[in-house]
Amino acid sequence: PEMGIYQIMEVLNVSRTANCVASVALGQRAIFEAYDFAKDRIAFGKPILEQPLLKAQFEEKLTSLKQAFALAWETVTLLDEVWLETPPYSDRYHLFRLMAHLGKYWTAEFAVQTAKWAMEVNAGLGTLKEFPVERWLREAMILSIWEGTPHRQILDGLEAMEQKGAHQLLLTHLAPYSDATEIDQWGQRISDHLGLPQDEKEAKAESLFSDLATFTANRLLHNKSL
């Protein structure tokens, strides 16, 4: 019985990692659905895919897809290293735990926003059940809710940083792909945040967590193995 909480954590570790992968896959499918429509939809004499604003948005979504993939892939890789661990957990496990929270939070939000955007690209047709794109938004919304809501990922990630020093492990992990100044600045920012009064620390945690996830994704993209 005393091992029950750890067995639950193992299930969540796997399911949150799977959620990261599912979010990337759904986002990629939504981008494809948007592309498939935009390349044939003519407005002002040319496909809307070639219109400057939408073209720029496609480029942004493809960049976000790469960032989401980087987070998901790193989460999978770390889980593969630590999934058989039992307490007391190693530093590598605590690094995985923070990565899983960052990945689940960021990739799920990516899936929701990308599916919503794909519906907008398809215009009125995007809202109709007869067309596939509206389904991706309905399915994307659950990805940010089950296996721990965004609030849960943020607060659990904060706890991993505060009690296990997981942010230090993460910054060390990212150091080979980062500028030393960036790493130092992030270390100071997180340290300052963890020193805030409890209510303020929680209230302001989302911007820190979101920025850290984005920074992590961008640094991982500099890893030549991705």
Segments (PLM) and residue ranges:
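Flavin-dependent oxidoreductase catalytic core characteristic
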Residues: 1-226
